[in-house]
Amino acid sequence: MYENTPVERVRENVLFTPEGRVKAEKIVFACHFPFVNFPGLYFAKMHQERSYVVALENAMEVNGMYIGAEKRDFSFRSYGPYLLLGGEGHRCGDKTGQAARYEKLREKAARWFPESREACCWSAQDCVTADSVPFIGRFSGSRQNWYVATGFQKWGMTTAMTAAMLIRDDICGFTNPNREVFRPGRLPVKDLDFFLSDGVRSVKELAKPFFYDPQKTARDILPGHGGIVTYKGRKIGIYKDEQQNIHGVEIRCPHLGCQLSWNPDEKSWDCPCHGSRFDYEGKLLNGPAQSGL
């Protein structure tokens, strides 16, 4: 086990890291979103969705975990002395209905648990496939010694166990009856519209840096807010902190070049194409990008 050693690229059975090379007969990509674009094309077969959680003290204790059946519903679970209230999910980088997502959760908490107090809050994201079934198995037809586990759609605790058994069985030569269900190379015909809509979205976002001309300047950005502005004839993303210091970044994602959008709830720059995220100073927060801005 090589800890604190990020893999930068992979070629056949060799992993390249900043400190050297590692050879392996079998390689498992269990890294949330596969950072190798070709082969596999996972960036074209998934997107990432982000959701938000507030931890409440002095709220009711619930046994088990609960989630609403509707797309915009909420989830509940107890953890020690806290009740975790989750919801307000959205596609990463989607500006529709953005901002005040934590506030909306706090409003629900005040309505449902008026005696509760907020202890902390956070957000996270996960990969979503076209048919909502994870990709678990061999990475691609041309890389039979590579394996992948991704697209858990926020069901990581159960799906991780499934992935462990499926990949173990394949590596050890055992037959698993569920192998075809999770096969990464599948392409459900009924979900072709998902691929088409995702493809159109990516093309649109890739074209934005060339055709979208922001009308704002740094003076138009209020303290505590961020946005895309024109500076010396080029587009940049800026965040103006409460002391009115300006933090500027390159606005194109280093993964495949999509234009980033500002997430006011997390004060981050998010990629609407494949879900990479960066803090307001450009530091990488989430992949598949492998470097900061």
Residue spans for each PLM region:
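C-terminal catalytic lobe of FAD-dependent flavoproteins
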Residues: 70-71, 80, 93-107, 111-199, ...
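Short, hydrophobic/aromatic-rich segments at coil-to-beta transitions
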Residues: 12-14, 61-64, 222-227, 246, ...
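Flavin-dependent oxidoreductases
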Residues: 6-77, 205, 213-219
